[in-house]
Curated annotation (Swiss-Prot):
Belongs to the CbiD family. Pathway: Cofactor biosynthesis; adenosylcobalamin biosynthesis; cob(II)yrinate a,c-diamide from sirohydrochlorin (anaerobic route): step 6/10. It comes from Geobacter sp. (strain M21). GO terms for molecular function: cobalt-precorrin-5B C1-methyltransferase activity. The keyword Methyltransferase applies. It catalyses: Co-precorrin-5B + S-adenosyl-L-methionine = Co-precorrin-6A + S-adenosyl-L-homocysteine. This is Cobalt-precorrin-5B C(1)-methyltransferase. Keywords: Cobalamin biosynthesis, Methyltransferase, S-adenosyl-L-methionine, Transferase. InterPro entries: CbiD, CbiD_sf. HAMAP family: CbiD. Its EC number is 2.1.1.195. PANTHER family: COBALT-PRECORRIN-5B C(1)-METHYLTRANSFERASE.
């Protein structure tokens, strides 16, 4: 490892609020703005460079380029545009609207109501605060409208889970702290929470927690459930289980391929770990204790990977049932009051096991 310290970045919400502040200052002062300072919800002050400023009559527009730091965020480098307009001698009002590349919410269960622009509560609050700050001393009755857009937002959104959550037409303006931690799991766990909320709001009684897209596809082929019922948990097994339990999900199906299920069976609540040999050693001990699988103990100790063991065993039924039963035990330990089932997806798109 190089030891290089990873850079933090800024959320779309922080960038939108910065662009709004710049556009508001341009309207107020009728002058260009090159940089704005913003106090983020986490209590940190940050400076944002402002680009593309245009002043025309009672409108002002500009944009801020999102810097996600060292986080692999699909929105890194995206331009967050804002057009501000003022209409004098009307009621005092601040309007926040979405434009090109900003999604609309079409499913219940999210922090934003159905039909509204996908601008989450914290960014919306940030925007209102900066507008009030800029126009604090102006008492002229006026309506201020701020339209947020991301030119390539609709295309970028295809690389996110927005469509699955029912956010169509573009990206969301997100963020609770204003900063993005590099290589952070929070974006993923936030999406897990939102996905479970949407599933419940759409009437799902069973939620499928998939470790990856391949296992999710297998589950979708074999379960007659609405698309909202399928939640991509990735490596966040423990978090996803507790999210479902805390929100009152009656039943979960944990769907994964063999290697991931072995990690869960070994008690890893976060399955992105590098203890593969330790997992196989633990599995070897379990195999030894069961007469039907005792002959596989040495094979497990010599296997390179969990997948290698599965294939070398000839997809041994007792081996598969042993691992899945261990997964169910871990599920019961994590969320004892929630019913759980396990689905083992094969590496070639087939279903290998589904617990009753």
């Amino acid at each position: 490892m190089s030891g290089k310290e990873l850079r933090y970045g800024f959320t779309t919400g922080a960038c939108a609020a910065a662009a709004v502040k710049a556009a508001a200052q341009m309207l107020r002062d009728q002058a260009m703005v090159r940089e704005v300072e913003l106090m983020l919800p986490c209590g940190i002050g940050a400076n944002f460079q402002v680009h593309g400023g245009v002043l025309r009559d009672n409108t002002a527009s500009c944009y801020v380029v999102k810097d996600a730091g060292d986080d692999p965020d699909v929105t890194n480098g995206a331009e967050i545009h804002v057009t501000a307009s003022i209409e004098f001698f009307t009621k005092n009002e601040i309007k926040i609207e979405g434009g090109t590349g900003i999604g609309r919410v079409t499913k219940p269960g999210l922090a934003v109501p159905v039909g509204a622009w996908a601008i989450n509560p914290v960014p919306r609050s940030m925007i209102l605060e900066v507008v009030k700050e800029v126009f604090a001393l102006r008492c002229i009755p006026a309506t201020l409208t701020f339209s947020i857009s991301i030119p390539n937002g609709e295309e970028l959104a295809k690389r996110t889970l927005n469509e699955r959550l029912g956010i169509v037409g573009g990206l969301s303006i997100l963020g609770t702290t204003g900063i993005v931690k590099p290589i952070s799991a929070k974006a993923w766990t936030d999406t897990v929470d939102a996905s479970v909320d949407v599933a419940l709001a759409c009437g799902a009684r069973t939620v499928v927690l998939a470790t990856g897209r391949s296992s999710e596809i297998v589950a979708q082929k074999h379960l007659s459930l609405s698309e909202e019922a399928f939640v991509m948990m990735g490596d966040h097994f423990g978090y996803a289980m507790r999210s479902c339990a805390s929100k009152g999900v009656p039943e979960v199906v944990v769907a994964g391929q063999f290697a991931k299920l072995v990690k869960i069976a070994c008690g890893h609540e976060q399955t992105h770990v590098t203890s593969s040999q330790m997992d196989l050693d633990a599995l070897a001990w379990w195999l030894r204790e069961v007469p039907a699988t005792a002959h596989l103990e040495q094979m497990a100790r010599e296997a390179n990977t969990a997948r290698h063991l599965l294939e070398a065993s000839g997809y041994n039924k007792a081996l598969i049932e042993l691992v899945c039963s261990r997964v169910l035990k871990v599920c019961a330990d994590v969320a004892p009051w929630m019913k759980a089932r396990v689905m083992l997806a094969g590496y070639h798109g087939d279903l290998l096991y589904f617990s009753p």
